[in-house]
Regions:
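Conserved donor-binding/catalytic core segment of Leloir-type glycosyltransferases
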Residues: 123-144, 150-154
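Short glycine/serine-rich donor-binding loops of glycosyltransferases
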Residues: 213-217
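Glycosyltransferase donor-sugar binding loop
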Residues: 136-137, 147-151, 161-179
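Acidic anion/phosphate-binding donor-loop and adjacent secondary structure
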Residues: 66-68, 96, 111-130
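Nucleotide-activated donor-binding/catalytic signature segment of Leloir-type glycosyltransferases, i.e.
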Residues: 171-202
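Aromatic "clamp/platform" in nucleotide-sugar-dependent glycosyltransferases that forms part
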Residues: 208
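A short, active-site helix/loop in glycosyltransferases that binds the activated sugar's phosphate group
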Residues: 79-105, 112-116
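Extended catalytic core of nucleotide-activated donor transferases of GT-like folds
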Residues: 11-80, 90
Length: 218
């Protein structure tokens, strides 16, 4: 929307023969968010428009989900890019240390739609009642912080903490995992998510090796 408002033309495919800048956000064709792969871009450069500039945005890694193939794949996909953009310095350092060959590396932090995710109608804790704690995740991987969330859920079994705090989890949870003392809400997005987040006073995240999740930004 920003680019369109600035007068630029935007396309989500490689059908045009005069694309100035190609942005790769997800080179894996198995991903639902992938419009084209790095191989598609490579063919475009070779047969259609060699002058197009390729920017590769990296926001994923093996470390966050204990996988062993993502980093190598992204490093290979990155070889056709003119510019690499990372969502955090932590992720940039990780890929540089693992041998990514890009010489142009920048960090651009992610952001949320401030028309939706803001402090409007948010009421801070006035200490008169329980402190309402919340977190949310779309992914259900254990590394999202479920070691922390399960401990918090366990704390709520005691009268001491049950009188002081509440915990709300919005999103998906791992298979064969369940909360006993936590309010569980199905995944939400947009205004519905923002409304529910504002019903609480403290946001926490226990996500491990997170390049830059959207959850804490929202």
């Amino acid at each position: 929307n920003y680019l369109l408002n600035m007068g630029y033309q935007v396309t989500t495919n490689l059908f045009e023969n005069d694309i100035d800048i190609i942005l790769i956000t997800e080179p894996r064709k198995t991903s639902e968010s992938s419009s084209y792969t790095h191989l598609d871009v490579k063919r475009y450069l070779k047969y259609v428009n060699y002058d197009a500039i390729v920017v590769h945005r990296l926001n994923e890694c093996d470390e966050r989900k204990n996988t062993n193939f993502v980093n190598d794949y992204l490093i290979e996909a990155n070889k056709i890019s003119d510019q690499s953009v990372y969502v955090s310095n932590w992720l940039k350092d990780l890929f540089i240390n693992q041998g990514i060959t890009s010489k142009r590396n920048n960090v651009i932090y992610g952001g949320a739609n401030t028309e939706i995710f803001n402090t409007q109608k948010f009421k801070p804790w006035d200490k008169s009642g329980k402190l309402k704690i919340v977190t949310h995740h779309w992914g259900a991987n254990w590394n999202k912080g479920f070691d922390v969330y399960s401990k918090l859920d366990k704390l709520l079994e005691t009268d001491y903490w049950n009188k002081k705090i509440e915990f709300c989890y919005i999103g998906n949870i791992p298979k064969d995992f369940s909360f006993k003392n936590t309010q569980l809400i199905s995944p939400l997005s947009g205004k519905e998510l923002a409304y529910e987040l504002k019903n609480n006073q403290l946001y926490i995240t226990g996500s491990l090796n997170e390049p830059s999740g959207n959850h804490h930004i929202e």
